[in-house]
């Protein structure tokens, strides 16, 4: 029966899925039910008993794209699991591309200065709970994949994976997920990410000495080590080995390669493990960075982590639908009249928010420098 179900879904969704997801003013009853501040929230779209709410600043297309993705994801799972999610009356809040998380009435904060910068940078895609209601938060630039937004994976699919886990799993599935994750830790997979830091602090058009910039950015690290890493190929410029005299500008790509194993996000805990393999089931995950290895598709997952893939199959079946970037669906359905190059804004973090992000990653990678000290037999002070 499950095969018939998914064949019918595939054949029928073109007719039954809403070609245009209707964006309406937020109603008083919606505001009461979801406890939404009508001074801020003005627009709403409902799909699969999920309410998408935003300020007036967020585009209707962002509403429609979010609704489309939710609709396809809800159709791409076993009916009983989808029904449990519907009963939770999930709330989705979209942050406008020119809004901050701290402007959402539910997520205001007393943080100030750099702490506020970090909060607004880091918290643009997450799952929370307001009372017992699952509440997902996304940024418009990530859903629509504007320039400057996330274009390498769907944050929406990842976070909705958490909704599926938290709201859709029964006790038996929870226990099975625990056992599946314990198997991951036992056999040691999802520990093959890339131990390398992108260095992005150089913003000048004019070329400057990379060694000098590195010394300034990493004052705790040995200048001798920095020189050695440049000449030995541990610090690459545009993917190439260089030397201590190299000059770079804002357009050059600098990578500090620490080497060795690196824990993937999927091996962090059972919750993130599920969200990561859920993404892969729909062919949308980043590859070969600080949190990811090479696995990003369903076919790859089946070969790499067959037990995790079987869990996905038993929860989701084998739906034909896969995530496809809205940039590649221009001209179709609700994106019929959308011109990506003309209609999508470029999103750039303010300099102080960029600094907060760079500071975070400097701290994140700090312990990995020891690998380079050991490699080159240089004592770390």
Language model features by range: what are they?
Residues 4-13:
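Sec-dependent N-terminal signal peptides
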Residues 16-19:
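Boundary at the C-terminal end of the N-terminal hydrophobic targeting segment
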Residues 21, 29, 37-40, 47-190, ...:
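Acidic/His-rich structured neighborhood in mature extracellular/periplasmic domains
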Residues 54-57, 260-268, 295-301:
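Active-site rim elements
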Residues 166-195, 253, 259-286:
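Post-HExxH zinc-binding segment in Zn-dependent metallohydrolases
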Residues 192-258:
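A basic, amphipathic helix-loop patch mediating RNA/tRNA/ribosome contacts
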Residues 271, 276-381:
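Pan-zinc metallopeptidase signature
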């Amino acid at each position: 029966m499950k095969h018939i179900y998914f064949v019918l879904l595939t054949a029928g969704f073109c007719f039954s899925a809403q070609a245009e997801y209707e964006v309406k003013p937020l109603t008083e009853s919606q505001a009461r039910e979801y406890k939404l501040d009508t001074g801020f929230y003005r627009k709403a779209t409902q799909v699969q008993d999920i309410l998408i709410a935003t300020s007036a600043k967020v585009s209707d297309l962002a509403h429609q794209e979010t609704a489309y993705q939710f609709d396809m994801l809800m159709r791409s799972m076993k009916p009983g699991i989808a029904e449990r999610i519907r009963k939770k009356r999930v709330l989705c809040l979209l942050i406008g591309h020119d809004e901050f998380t701290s402007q959402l009435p539910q997520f205001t904060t007393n943080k100030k200065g750099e702490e506020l910068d970090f909060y607004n940078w880091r918290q643009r895609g997450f799952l929370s709970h307001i009372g017992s209601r699952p509440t997902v938060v996304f940024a418009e630039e990530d859903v629509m994949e504007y320039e400057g937004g996330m274009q390498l994976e769907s944050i929406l699919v990842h976070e909705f994976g958490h909704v599926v886990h938290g709201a859709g799993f029964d006790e038996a599935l929870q226990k099975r997920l625990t056992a599946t994750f314990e198997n991951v830790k036992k056999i040691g997979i999802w520990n093959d990410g890339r131990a390398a830091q992108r260095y992005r602090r150089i913003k000048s058009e004019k070329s400057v000495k990379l060694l000098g910039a590195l010394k300034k950015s990493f004052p705790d690290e040995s200048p001798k080590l920095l020189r050695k890493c440049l000449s030995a190929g541990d610090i690459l410029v545009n993917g190439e080995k260089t030397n201590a005299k190299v000059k770079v500008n804002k357009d050059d790509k600098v990578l500090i390669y620490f080497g060795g194993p690196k824990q993937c996000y999927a091996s962090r805990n059972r919750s993130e493990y599920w969200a990561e393999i859920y993404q892969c089931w729909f062919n949308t995950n980043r590859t070969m960075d600080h949190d990811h290895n090479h696995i990003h598709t369903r076919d790859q997952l089946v070969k790499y982590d067959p037990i995790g893939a079987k869990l996905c199959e038993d929860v989701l079946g084998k739906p034909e639908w896969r995530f496809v970037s809205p940039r590649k669906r221009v001209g179709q359905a609700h994106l019929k009249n959308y011109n990506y190059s003309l209609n999508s804004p470029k999103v750039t973090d303010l300099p102080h928010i960029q600094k907060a992000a760079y500071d975070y990653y400097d701290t994140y990678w700090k312990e990995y420098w020891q690998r380079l000290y050991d490699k080159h037999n240089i004592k770390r002070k």
